[in-house]
């Protein structure tokens, strides 16, 4: 389990709740900004030679990433007519799957072009993409009126995040082949 996986899994429900409370557009744009800033800091960590900075930057990147898919999915779920909703949500899932495959391939290509000692470019490529998405989002994403939602349950969110992190850590570290009856 990496810091990215832990922060990503923990941030998904938090970002979803924040989007319900403050609106999808601002939290989606915040998520993209955090992802872009985290990516920039990941690249800079190579330049300053700081492994600690890389770990913190990956966590920032993951927190931003944790808001992107659920908020986009929720937006498609409410803005698309019910008869086309299945197709739209399938498209979102398909794009996300292709993006994961393309991202890995693009990262390999970048390493082949610039050399493995210049791995920071894998992260730098996300920065202009994030800026472009933010600009397009500011222009094209609708501003939905936020309905009155109950206050954010900080204790509940804290317990949920702790449970998710514990579960991920436990599943990752259990030795299934050495279980005693």
Task: Give the positions of each predicted feature.
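Short, contiguous strand/loop micro-motifs
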Residues: 1-2, 97
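Hydrophobic/aromatic residues in alpha-helical transmembrane segments
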Residues: 2, 72, 137, 166-170
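Central cavity-lining transmembrane alpha-helices of secondary-active solute carriers
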Residues: 2-16, 69-73
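Alpha-helical transmembrane segments of integral membrane proteins
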Residues: 5, 11, 130-133, 160-163
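ATP/adenylate-binding site constellation spanning eukaryotic-like Ser/Thr protein kinases
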Residues: 15, 103, 164
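Helix-loop-helix hairpins in multi-pass membrane proteins, especially solute transporters
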Residues: 19-155
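Phenylalanine-glycine-rich, low-complexity intrinsically disordered regions
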Residues: 145-146, 161-181
């Amino acid at each position: 389990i990496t810091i990215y996986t832990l922060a990503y899994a923990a941030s998904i429900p938090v970002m979803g709740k924040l989007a319900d409370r403050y609106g999808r557009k601002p939290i989606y744009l915040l998520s993209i900004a955090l992802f872009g800033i985290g990516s920039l800091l990941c690249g800079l960590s190579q330049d300053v030679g700081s492994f600690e900075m890389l770990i913190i930057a990956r966590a920032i990147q993951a927190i931003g990433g944790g808001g992107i898919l659920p908020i986009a999915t929720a937006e498609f779920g409410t803005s698309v007519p019910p008869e086309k909703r299945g197709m739209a949500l399938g498209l979102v899932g398909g794009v996300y799957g292709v993006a994961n495959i393309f991202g890995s391939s693009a990262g390999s290509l970048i390493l082949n072009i610039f050399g493995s000692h210049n791995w920071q470019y894998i992260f730098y490529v996300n920065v202009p993409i994030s800026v472009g998405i933010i600009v397009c989002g500011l222009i094209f994403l609708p501003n939905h009126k936020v309905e009155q939602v109950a206050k954010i349950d900080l204790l509940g969110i804290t317990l949920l995040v702790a449970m998710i992190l514990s579960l991920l850590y436990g599943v990752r570290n259990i030795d299934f082949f050495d279980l005693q009856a």
